[in-house]
Amino acid sequence: MFIARALLALAYPVLAHLAGARGDGTLAALALGDLVLIVLLEPLLRGRAWAWALALAAGAGLWRLAGSAQATLPLLLVPVVVVALVAWMFGRTLGAGRVPLITRIVAALEGCAPEALAPPLRRYTRALTVGWAVLLAVLALANLALAAVAVPGGLLDGLGRTPPVAVTRAQWSWFANALGYGVVGGAFVGEYLLRKRLFPGRYHSFADFLHRLARLGPAFWRELLRG
């Protein structure tokens, strides 16, 4: 199931970019259908009737959307909503009495309670949680701004307004479906290198770091996302 979901996740930005750059309604519907499958994959594989009903209803709706002049419009908002949601997930853990999200992850990697982490590591992981929340919020706003001024078919253009500055749909799509992921990936790798320098001896390599994250298991990640 993990591999299937990962393949679907990798397929989405490709489909979304091609749909956005070409203004292709069929590809847009396929990209949105890909998202539906990502969300419903587990209950679909378990044969849940409600999941199949939702999937069939979504498929019917996307079939009609594919032929609409507004078929690519939802793709403008998907990167904004998804990135903003992840930024919120980081930010909500920074409130009083909460354990910052990165602190919880590092404590799990260290095999101890968050309060048992060394004070410098606790401070670092809190600052890192702030950094991720800010970076993702900025990316969400950038996605929204570019979606608004994309021509043709951007948010302002769709409302009949002429944007003060404009980018092409292809330029918006490259940022939303490629460059944004590159920024996140680069920040992730860069932070690993910084952490390895500041707190040496914890990970043998980047591959070891990823392996240890994976070994935390689905139950840990589900609980983490629930907050």
What is each residue range found by the language model?
Residues M1-L7:
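N-terminal membrane topogenic signal
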Residues P114-G227:
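C-terminal membrane-adjacent module
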Residues L41-L85, L155-R169:
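Long, highly hydrophobic alpha-helical transmembrane signal-anchor segments
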Residues L73-W132:
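Membrane-proximal helix-loop-helix units in multi-pass membrane proteins
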Residues A16-G33:
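Structural signature of hydrophobic alpha-helical transmembrane segments
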Residues A11, L15-L18, L37-L44, G61-L62, ...:
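Residue-level signal for alpha-helical transmembrane segments in multi-pass membrane proteins
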